[in-house]
Amino acid sequence: MEVGGIQALRRWRAEQSGRVGLVPTMGALHSGHQALMTRARAESDLVVASIFVNPLQFGADEDFVQYPRPIEEDLKKCEEAGVDFVFAPALAEMYPSAPEVRVVAGRMGAVFEGAARPGHFDGVLTVVAKLFTLIDPDVTVFGLKDIQQYVLVKRMIADLNFDIELIGLPVVRDADGLAMSSRNTYLAPEDRARALAIPRALNAAAEVAERGRGTAGSGAGAGAGGAGAAAGSGGAGADLPAAVEAAALAELEPAAERGELEIVYCNLVEAATLRPCPPGFTGPALLLVSATVGGTHLIDNLPLEF
C-alpha cells in the first residue's frame, strides 16, 4: 500500500491501468469505512482511500481543530481493507490559498444539515469534486448514513458530467443500534445511552410504515419503544407520511423534554428531491433525523417505500 499527497498520487495513477475505486474519508476510520473499502475492492481493480479533514465543510463554531486524526491507526485499517493507495494530502496542497471558486450545493444543500450548518455542503461538494478530478475514479463508494451528502453527490455527478459510478452502502450500526460515526468518540457513556433514542425513533417509524403499507425499509437495529404503537393508530389512514413522522417524534420529544438531547430535525422527505412528503405520497422516501447529544451533532436516516 502506498501513501502520499498530490504528486505521489499523480505518479502512481499514471502507472496504473484497470478500474479504480475511490472511498473519500476524513479519517478517524471505523469498520463502517472498512465496509466501504471492501465494497470498492469488489467493484474495482484498484482502490484509493482519501484521508483529508476538509476545513471547508466545518462551520466557525465546529470542531475542525479537535477533529480526531489518528493517522497511524487509519493507515492500518486501510491496509486491512486492501486499499492500494491512501491519498493523504497536506492542507496546503489541497488549498494553497482560500478558494475563490467553489461548488454550490443549491436548494438541496440549504435544508436539513445545510440549514443547521450553513455552507457545509458547498464545502463537501467542492472537496469531492477536487478528489474526482485528482483521482479520476471509475467508481466511488459512499455510506448512506450521510444520506443528504449522497443525494447531493449523485446530483453533482449528473450535473457536472462526471463519468463515475456512485454506489451507496447502507448504514452500518453498532450492536446497540447507533449508527457508526467518527463523532461517536465524543460521546460520554451516558450520552451514548441517550443517543439510542435516535435508532428507537427510526424503528418506531418503520413499524408504523409497515402496518400502514405492509412494506418499509429495514429498522435501525435497536428495539422500538412503545411510542411506535401509540403513533401507529393513524398509520393506515390517508396521511401515512405524517403518521410515520409523528411516530419518530413520539420517541424523540420525551427525551428532549428531559434534557437528554436537542432535536435538530425529524422529517419525512421525498428521496429524490428532499422535499416534504405530501399526504398520500407514494414512492421512495427518507426519514431524516438529527439531534445534538452532549454537544455532539448526530445524524441518521431510514429509507422507506410508500
Could you describe each region identified by the protein language model?
Residues 46, 284-286:
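Structural motif
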Residues 259, 280-283:
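A structural signal for short secondary-structure junctions
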Residues 1-219, 226-261, 269, 273, ...:
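Nucleotidyltransferase catalytic core that binds NTPs
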Residues 286-306:
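Generic C-terminus detector
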Residues 264-281, 288:
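A conserved acidic, glycine/proline-rich C-terminal tail/linker
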